[in-house]
Amino acid sequence: MNKRTTYCGLVTEEFLNEKVTLKGWVHNRRDLGGLIFVDLRDREGIVQIVFNPDFSEEALQVAETVRSEYVVEVEGVVTKRDAETINPKIKTGQVEVQVSNIEIINKSETPPFSINEENVNVDENIRLKYRYLDLRRQELAQTFKMRHQTTRSIRQYLDNNGFFDIETPVLTKSTPEGARDYLVPSRVHEGEFYALPQSPQLFKQLLMISGFDKYYQIVKCFRDEDLRADRQPEFTQVDIEMSFVDQEDIIAMGEDMLRKVVKDVKGIDVSGPFPRMTYAEAMDRFGSDKPDTRFGMELINVSQLGKEMNFKVFKDTVDNNGEIKAIVAKDAANKYTRKDMDALTEFVNIYGAKGLAWVKVVDDGLSGPIARFFEDVNVETLKQLTEAKPGDLVMFVADKPNVVAQSLGALRIKLAKELGLIDESKLNFLWVTDWPLLEYDEDAKRYVAAHHPFTSPKREDIEKLDTEPENVQANAYDIVLNGYELGGGSIRIHDGELQQKMFEVLGFTNEQAQEQFGFLLDAFKYGAPPHGGIALGLDRLVMLLTNRTNLRDTIAFPKTASATCLLTDAPGEVSDKQLQELSLRIRH
């Protein structure tokens, strides 16, 4: 075998008249009777190679036996394509390789699905079972090239700005951080378990106490939680922590890094500073703590109608301290039938809304199921509040504020997709700040941390921890991109007494706090610097930069929605001997 001189996808006009050695997979083969054309593929792309008896009769005979996905090595000379055969769709489309020698390195059975088609209409489970074949597709090859470019850009930025890449343990202690832990039984310590880290949160804080000042890690994290399209049980996080900083320092660093990544990976200049919005404003205007700002259709408070109208649903809602909000779908009145509106009503029911009221704005007023409840003065109020015009569709939810936000926020996204309102070329970054420190868990009847127990409250709110914990704001911030939470961070608690107080508010006894977090509380006794950080979801960032809609497309060997690996059949049963060594017994 000869040494490869270049990749297939890099053979351009600069190689004209040069002899090259290429290695790759047969992407496509066309026998034109006397001439055989093969598209040869590798990770960089495709180049057309030609088998011509005038060039090599022996090579032509071998080419007659090759089939799709055979692995071959070819030698030949790069020539200019005839004008009528130039392919402007690919980088190598101006040239072809006249083959003088071919060697079949390995044969292939017929794949279970086509690899040489751009849009593979095949069940995802089949693709995941044969993931090594799926990854040969150019679409996915490009995705993972961009993933590499993304991580390279991140490392370059952090290295150039004085950060140390430090690894933290994978086998650690189970602590209550939100989701369920993946547990690993210890053979040496019978009946005891390690946990796989949900994040390196505590270790990166300990590194700040150790004096390392600037830390980063591109790290695997594990969470045993219910899955959806943008979640995986194991995922990659860009984890960053800094000492002697405030929120502004971390936001500035995060923006600089993300602008560099977008420039390096997509060649796009993103202007800064990124817009900011408080948590309260995001929920009020968009019904979401991760608003997609690529389009309008904001939530509008129309609770005034509940006071003016003789419509029992609206009136009762306002009388019971609820609220009424509306969204306006411009020029959509004729695009949704009553049956469509029934389907939208069922959609908001998922989010706890009892119903979806709606009217269509027409030239002489309103039409629709609740139009009869609107008197002329109410119509004018509605138009003033919503700026609705004839042809618009106005939808209302009247309920508790959190139900209104969740249901209309989700409906807003659904309608925008259906109506084609989203400019997919945009990258809209947004910081969401001033989060509540705590949330009240109705089931547990206690407060839980909105982010995690180590987030510091705003200094001016510390005294409220005892009297009105629901009104304490956190030194926390999320970075949002196109309606997805890209990452989040906070300034951490660095005072042992305040951390102990936080545990008390969360319902921990002193003994429980010491048992679970004693090592952190002890570390605070030895001079902890002020510190804070941020963690970005790498898989999600790549998904958004590559315009994918499924997180699994950005992970080489992902799990399914039920947390299984169809390629390896993990998780799987283990032998009785292995269970005995771990002092475990399975109960069915």
From Swiss-Prot:
GO terms for cellular component: cytoplasm. Its EC number is 6.1.1.12. Disulfide bonds: none annotated. ATP binds at R223, D224, E225, Q232, E485, G537, L538, D539, R540. SUPFAM superfamilies: Class II aaRS and biotin synthetases (SSF55681), GAD domain-like (SSF55261), Nucleic acid-binding proteins (SSF50249). It is found in: Cytoplasm. Its main location: cytoplasm. It catalyses: tRNA(Asp) + L-aspartate + ATP = L-aspartyl-tRNA(Asp) + AMP + diphosphate. CDD domains: AspRS_core, EcAspRS_like_N. Gene3D superfamilies: Bira Bifunctional Protein, Domain 2, GAD-like domain, Nucleic acid-binding proteins. Residues 201-204 are annotated as: Aspartate. Belongs to the class-II aminoacyl-tRNA synthetase family. Type 1 subfamily. Catalyzes the attachment of L-aspartate to tRNA(Asp) in a two-step reaction: L-aspartate is first activated by ATP to form Asp-AMP and then transferred to the acceptor end of tRNA(Asp). This is Aspartate--tRNA ligase. The lineage of its organism: Bacteria, Bacillati, Bacillota, Bacilli, Bacillales. The gene is aspS.
